[in-house]
Regions:
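A conserved acidic beta->alpha catalytic loop
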Residues: 48-56, 108
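Short, acidic, metal-binding catalytic loop of nucleotide-sugar glycosyltransferases
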Residues: 31-41
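Acceptor/aglycone-binding surface of glycosyltransferases and processive sugar-polymer synthases
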Residues: 77-95, 112-192, 217-227
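Conserved donor nucleotide-binding strand/loop of the catalytic core
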Residues: 42, 46, 56-95
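Hydrophobic helical membrane-anchoring modules
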Residues: 1-9, 160, 187-272, 276, ...
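Short aromatic/hydrophobic "clamp" motif used to bind/position activated sugar donors
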Residues: 101
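Cell-envelope/extracellular polymer assembly enzymes that use nucleotide-activated donors
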Residues: 11-13, 43, 197
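Acidic helix N-cap motif at the loop->helix transition within catalytic regions
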Residues: 23-27, 53-62
Length: 326
């Protein structure tokens, strides 16, 4: 991976993952530059996956043409292979010098004039994540056929219902966030929806949505293909499993107030109580002989002891059949 490194501490870092964007890259960089005051320390990080159309070279040439008269720096990261959008974004985050980061596409589907609105949302509302949203009041999509819109709606519904995320547009690829909210988190970098993974893995963050009009690209070709769709479902499944694991860990942590020995004793005592109560209930409320009632009481106490020991006393053990069958 080769880089054009510009040493600079920026106020805002903008990450542009690219692949074969030679027709758009210079124009998008010019529009980004025009969207901010000339004295603002702005850093654009281009993460290029070895584009054969010289996208990275065009970006480098553009930077050399403006660096003497602008505080806008451009860092071009050249990767040796096409490793995916999410991993490109993570590369960009690692190389960024600002705490406020913007992620966007370079094909003009994400209008650069919306970037200041995202930054304002973070500064004025003190939110942690500002999402450019197609699905809030004032947002829309232009240039997509009905089939593509339907696919987007279904993907959004799956993310919201399946993963429990709250924003209207969790599938947006255009968003800003405070870099420090990612501290301590590990990412799978699978697929192309980095925002979705951030939403699932960050807790207690404040989110704002900014409406915008998504416009389908005019130049270059779309990156959506079958592998992208497959990666999406893979990432949703992995995030779902991640969420379930976190829920289990939190549930277990909430009852970790007794040692294993104390829990085992407590479960045993509760079994005696359940045995006694069940025996009394069966004998007093039916014509059942006391021996039969006691037998049912024993069955209830054995069952309760088994379940309590499995899910509480030994909650850190895996009792799945493949682990328990010898």
């Amino acid at each position: 991976m080769k880089r054009l490194i510009i040493l600079n501490t920026a106020e805002i870092s903008i990450i542009l993952p690219t692949y074969n964007e030679s027709k758009n890259i210079r124009g998008i960089l010019e529009h980004i530059k025009k969207s901010f005051p000339s004295n603002l320390k702005l850093e654009t990080i281009i993460v290029d996956d070895n584009s054969p159309d010289n996208t990275a070279k065009i970006a480098e040439d553009y930077f050399h043409s403006i660096k003497e008269k602008s505080s806008h720096s451009i860092n071009v990261i050249k990767r040796k292979a096409k490793n995916g959008l999410s991993s490109a974004i993570l590369n960009g985050i690692q190389e960024s010098s600002a705490n406020t980061i913007v992620v966007m596409d370079s094909d003009f589907s994400h209008p650069p004039n919306i970037i200041p609105k995202l930054i304002d949302a973070i500064k004025q509302t003190r939110c942690d994540i500002a999402i450019a949203s197609r699905y809030v009041n004032g947002g829309s999509i232009q240039g997509w056929p009905i089939k593509r819109k339907l696919m987007s709606k279904v993907a959004t519904l799956i993310a919201k219902k399946g993963l429990g995320v709250k924003p209207h547009d969790p599938m947006s690829g255009f968003f800003a966030f405070k870099k420090n909210i990612l501290d301590g988190l590990k990412f799978d970098a699978l697929g192309y929806k980095m925002l979705l993974e951030i939403l699932v893995k960050t807790k207690g963050v404040k989110i704002e949505e900014v409406p915008y009009t998504f416009t389908d690209r005019e130049l270059g070709s779309s990156k959506l293909d079958t592998s992208t769709i497959v990666d999406y479902f893979k990432s949703v499944w992995k995030l779902y499993k991640y969420g379930r694991t976190v829920e289990k860990d939190e549930s277990r942590a909430s009852v970790r107030f007794l040692s294993k020995a104390a829990r085992f004793f407590t479960v045993g005592a509760s079994g005696l109580a359940i045995n006694y109560l069940a025996s009394m209930i069966f004998s007093l409320n039916s014509d059942m002989w006391y021996i039969h009632a006691t037998t049912f009481g024993i069955i209830f106490s054995i069952s309760s002891n088994f379940l309590l020991n499995k899910y509480w006393t030994f909650e850190d053990r895996d009792f799945s059949p493949k682990r328990t069958i010898i």
